[in-house]
Amino acid sequence: MKDLKRKIHYWCSDTMRNKITGKGVVCAVLDTGITQHPDLVGRIVGWKDCVQGKKTIYDDNGHGTHVAGILAGNGKSGRGLYSGMAPEAQIFAVKVLNQRGGGKIRDVINGIRYVLLKQKEMKIRIVNISIGTLPHKKDPEDELFLFWVERLWDAGLVVVTAAGNKG
């Protein structure tokens, strides 16, 4: 673990030393939503709520805001000690998960479809989808979800997904 931390530290130092900050990059985050946070001020450039249809940004779970911070937090609230991987990137937030962090695959698919609709207008280049499922029997919805993820790839977007929390 110590070696892993050291490698991550060196990688982060390399990106900052080479001024890889995410400036000019818009990342769509499909998650539980997003709230205004000091580390994200002025960089939330879009919003869509596929769960409840609210027009104002919110995160009733906190996970989406956390993910956005890992991605693009500028570290101001932590006096620069903790910043995201791309501290100048912009966030296009899409709420696809409910207050408990769960959701319906159709909401995720609707979120993906919305990102594809807005990709050119908002200049979205990266899509983060932090969802996971437990192993289960084959479900037709899984195939539909994969179809739409492949549409993201076909559109030239970089897609980042969660590896899971269960090992």
Task: Please report, for each region that a protein language model flagged, where it lies by residue.
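A broad, low-specificity signal for short, low-complexity segments enriched in glycine/proline
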Residues: 8, 54-55, 88-90, 121, ...
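Subtilisin-like serine protease catalytic core
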Residues: 16-27, 34-46, 55-106, 122-125
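Short, well-ordered amphipathic alpha-helical segments that serve as non-catalytic structural scaffolds
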Residues: 8-10, 74, 111-112
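A generic local structural motif
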Residues: 12-16, 55, 78-80, 113-115, ...
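Autoinhibitory propeptides
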Residues: 1-16
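Generic enzyme active-site microenvironment
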Residues: 29, 93, 160-162
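Substrate-binding/access-modulating region of protease and related hydrolase catalytic domains
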Residues: 97-167
